[in-house]
Regions:
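Surface-exposed loop/turn motifs in large extracellular/passenger domains
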Residues: 1-199
Length: 199
């Protein structure tokens, strides 16, 4: 509800992130969807060992202030290697499905994908590709769809799909599609899809 005045403290307890990556991942991270059916005779067009008709579409959703997907650790450095296959372009993070961080209640920030910012360094091989969607929403609070925190090194962000943030309605709130914090490192951002922030 938009009015939380009648809710008890235990009703407003915050959950954690849906996905936390606090260790090294040599083969990269992919949030995938079934491939397009270009050849009806081929039941496994992406050659991943699973019949395409039996594959689902990745959806990661968090209600509350925690990031839907958090990559990094407070006590150690984290290295994300490249995802296999030419379609990944050598990138360590590929998002073909959807990620959403929804603050839900009034004054609770929303965070989609957060890399770094916890204390340890995070390196992502090649960068990241968004073919699907990464989004964040809030009710009168900050919202960031993608945030690179201090210590994050992501060579590039390639957006073919959508990175969107909605929320904040006051002069002090920040709504950002992509936020790059001090201490984060990125060489380029390319966009042939949509990157938006709406207050």
């Amino acid at each position: 509800p938009s009015d939380v005045s009648k809710l008890d403290a235990d009703d407003l307890l915050q959950g954690g992130s849906a996905v936390i990556v606090a260790g090294n991942v040599g083969g990269g991270i992919i949030f995938d969807v079934p491939p397009k059916d270009n050849d009806p005779a081929n039941k496994d067009e992406d050659n991943d060992g699973i019949e395409d008709s039996k594959e689902g579409s990745a959806v990661v959703l968090t209600k509350g202030s925690a990031a839907a997907v958090q990559i990094g650790s407070a006590t150690a450095n984290t290295a994300i290697g490249p995802v296999a296959g030419t379609a990944a372009g050598g990138h360590g993070i590929v998002i073909n499905g959807s990620i959403l961080g929804d603050g839900a209640y009034k004054d609770i920030q929303g965070n989609g994908l957060v890399i770094g910012g916890l204390g340890g360094n995070v390196s992502v091989a090649g960068g990241m590709t968004v073919n699907g969607s990464v989004s964040a929403s809030s009710n009168a609070a900050n919202a960031a769809a993608v945030r690179l925190g201090s210590g994050a090194t992501v060579p590039t962000i390639k957006t073919v799909g959508a990175i969107t943030a909605t929320g904040g309605s006051t002069a002090t709130t920040l709504v950002r599609g992509i936020a790059i914090d001090a201490g984060a490192s990125i060489a380029s951002i390319t966009n042939s899809g949509r990157i938006s922030a709406t207050a």
